[in-house]
């Protein structure tokens, strides 16, 4: 180790050049940075940075190896475990999957009641379902919730004595759940009403939160922390509407690429939403949540789905179920960062159409 003693520093217009550099704690204060798809194999020194362009990961070199640096932001409305419930099957079973690992679904527990065509949303730790039709086609004003980390049956923690809804859609930003549209009767009374639930630990009741730009049912929704989007629906054109979690109402902003008939399944991350577009049984569209721009094509599902459910971990979306040719148990997945067609994920425990899904930890 060397000792450097400085008595006087004078401004002579040129910098002092230390031939062997300066080390602080064994590392140079001047660090190299490399962005590449493969790890730098030579010339690495403690403190050097490498950005892995192929996997969007960041590393720093210490003790003869690159160590990953991660900053994991809290995810308030998605997570590692996806849960699918409801649907037209006469079964109370809730299915769950680990979204990062392809495979068949497993029994999570039982729903609080048997309903299809309800809405689903997540605050990151709990999943919520509201509304729907029972086997007698009676529209419900009740809902239920589960805790993602604990397998078991759902409990009744959400509802609205003034509004029964089926074939609506839901989303959540941790603080609030937004429910839009749907029908108050079986195939009748399609509405443009928006309901808002304040997320609390106990029972949650809805309050009126304005109206959408059009009546809708069978539509899909996704959101970031401040803004939510609704995607089309049977009783509308291929429109995209936007609303705020803190200001009532939602209005038209853009268009889907397809006809938007009953997209039902949408998910994404904190920047982008991907929705089943409704043009065929396979078309997927994508939008940037904060932009007022028309959707663009993302790709195709690998199997025909119609009225699927969706869940996401922020990197991958799994679409499940549907009714293209009878009730389906297929699941397909896409990677949010990469446009293209989906891949087979596995099977639900039961075939179901109009199932709804959400995810959390």
Briefly describe each language-model feature range.
Residues 2-361:
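Polar, enzyme-active/binding microenvironments
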């Amino acid at each position: 180790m060397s000792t450097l003693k400085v008595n006087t520093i004078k401004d002579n217009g040129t910098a002092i050049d230390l031939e062997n550099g300066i080390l602080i704690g064994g590392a140079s204060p001047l660090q190299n940075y490399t962005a590449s798809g493969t790890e730098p194999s030579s010339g690495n020194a403690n403190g050097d940075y490498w950005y892995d362009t192929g996997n969007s990961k960041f590393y720093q070199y210490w003790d003869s190896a690159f160590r990953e640096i991660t900053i994991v932001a809290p995810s308030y409305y998605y997570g590692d475990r996806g849960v699918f419930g409801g649907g037209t099957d006469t079964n109370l079973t809730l299915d769950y999957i680990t979204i990062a690992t392809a495979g068949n679904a497993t029994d999570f527990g039982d729903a609080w009641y048997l309903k299809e065509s309800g809405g689903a949303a997540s605050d990151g730790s709990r999943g919520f379902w509201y509304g729907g039709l029972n086997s007698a086609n009676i529209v419900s004003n009740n809902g239920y919730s589960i805790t993602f980390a604990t397998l078991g049956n759902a409990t009744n923690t959400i509802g609205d004595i003034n509004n029964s809804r089926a074939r609506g859609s839901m989303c959540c930003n941790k603080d609030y759940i937004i429910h839009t549209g749907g029908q108050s009767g079986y195939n009748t009374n399609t509405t443009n009403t928006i309901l808002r639930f304040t997320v609390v630990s106990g029972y949650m009741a809805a309050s009126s939160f304005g109206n959408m730009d059009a009546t809708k049912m069978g539509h899909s929704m996704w959101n970031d922390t401040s803004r939510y989007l609704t995607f089309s629906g049977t009783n509308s054109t291929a429109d995209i509407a936007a609303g705020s979690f803190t200001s009532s109402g939602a209005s038209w902003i853009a268009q889907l690429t397809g006809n938007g008939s009953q997209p039902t399944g949408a998910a994404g991350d904190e920047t982008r939403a991907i929705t089943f577009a409704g043009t065929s049984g396979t078309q997927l569209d994508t939008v940037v949540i904060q932009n007022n721009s028309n959707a663009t094509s993302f790709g195709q599902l690998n199997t025909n789905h119609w009225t699927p459910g969706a869940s996401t971990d922020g990197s991958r979306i799994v679409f499940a179920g549907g009714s293209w040719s009878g009730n389906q148990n297929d699941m397909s997945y896409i990677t949010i960062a990469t446009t293209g067609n989906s891949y087979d994920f596995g099977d639900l425990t039961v075939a179901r159409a109009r199932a709804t899904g959400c995810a959390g930890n």
